């Protein structure tokens, strides 16, 4: 079988797939396909995988060819379904594989990486493998895997969160400054206490005359001098 024929048939099959079911009558094939999740190989079909948005899940397939003729693995795809009503939520991007030839009675392995980015909920992952055999492309569904998908927890030290915190902090500080310049200054001017003027000690302690004062010939006020002292001065002058 020519590789160009395989790829042409593969492309034509993808173009005519409706809901990932081939058109025409279904055929029974003796090809066994299973897979494990590399990140959690202990999970079985009866377990529920727990994934976070942003995770990359690696499916490792094992294809056993029990047919009498050679088969070729040429692609892989899949879908996430609602496990309750079986409705398709999203389809996985179709990926090219190999092509990898599998002789009768032999098995091969290959990987598929899936980037998880869905609305947090419960899903069922159902992969599909494209097999080329006798110039025909066959789409073989694999077992389903139940999975719970949640959003990843945001770390306080996440650079995106730190940047957002800085932007909010700068914005908040800017609003406070503008508010103070517009209203704060005027408000504080109106409620701020007025400082009393200080009077110097010299002015505060100087006596204030309460009555008329007389000045003697000597040039000073004699009202405060005792009379006896003044009489003694006059007596001395007479003598």
Curated annotation (Swiss-Prot):
Keywords: Endoplasmic reticulum, Membrane, Signal, Transmembrane, Transmembrane helix. Residues 183-239 are cytoplasmic. It is found in: Endoplasmic reticulum membrane. Pfam families: TRAP_alpha. It is a single-pass type I membrane protein. Residues 20-161 are lumenal. Residues 1-19 form the signal peptide. GO terms for cellular component: endoplasmic reticulum membrane. The keyword Iron does not apply. Residues 201-213 have a biased composition (Low complexity). The keyword NADP does not apply. Residues 201-222 are annotated as: Disordered. The chain crosses the membrane at residues 162-182. Belongs to the IRC22 family. Is probably involved in a pathway contributing to genomic integrity. This is Increased recombination centers protein 22-2. It comes from Candida albicans (strain WO-1). The lineage of its organism: Eukaryota, Fungi, Dikarya, Ascomycota, Saccharomycotina.
């Amino acid at each position: 079988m020519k590789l160009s024929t395989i790829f042409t048939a593969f492309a034509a099959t993808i173009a005519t797939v409706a809901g990932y079911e081939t058109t025409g009558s279904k055929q029974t094939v003796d090809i066994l396909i299973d897979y494990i999740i590399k990140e959690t190989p202990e999970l079985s079909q009866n377990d529920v995988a727990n994934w976070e948005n942003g995770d990359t899940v690696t499916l490792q397939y094992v294809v056993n060819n029990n047919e009498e003729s050679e088969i070729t693995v040429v692609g892989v795809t899949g879908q996430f379904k609602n496990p309750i009503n079986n409705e398709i939520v999203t389809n996985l991007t179709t990926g090219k594989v190999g092509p990898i030839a599998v002789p009768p009675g032999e098995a091969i392995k290959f990987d598929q990486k899936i980037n998880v980015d869905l609305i947090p909920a419960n899903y069922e992952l159902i992969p599909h493998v494209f097999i080329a055999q006798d110039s025909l492309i066959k789409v073989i569904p694999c077992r389903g895997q139940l999975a719970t998908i949640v959003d990843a927890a945001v770390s306080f030290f996440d650079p995106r969160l730190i940047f957002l915190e800085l932007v909010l902090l700068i914005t908040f500080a800017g609003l406070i400054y503008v508010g103070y310049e517009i209203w704060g200054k005027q408000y504080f001017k109106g409620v701020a206490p007025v400082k009393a003027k200080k009077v110097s000690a010299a002015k505060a302690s100087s006596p204030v005359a309460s009555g008329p004062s007389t000045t003697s010939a000597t040039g000073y006020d004699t009202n405060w001098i005792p009379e006896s002292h003044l009489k003694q001065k006059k007596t001395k002058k007479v003598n």
